[in-house]
């Protein structure tokens, strides 16, 4: 979807995944 692609925020997505990876790493 073009509209959704326009609203895409790479930095926000990266930060979100970074937090998830950190939490996942901490669990292990």
Curated annotation (Swiss-Prot):
It is found in: Secreted, Extracellular space. InterPro entries: Calycin, Lipocalin_CS. Keywords: Olfaction, Secreted, Sensory transduction, Transport. GO terms for biological process: sensory perception of smell. It comes from the Eukaryota. One of its GO terms (cellular component) is extracellular region. The keyword Secreted applies. Nasal mucosa. The keyword Secreted applies. Belongs to the calycin superfamily. Lipocalin family. This soluble protein may play a specific role in odor discrimination and perception. This is Odorant-binding protein 1.
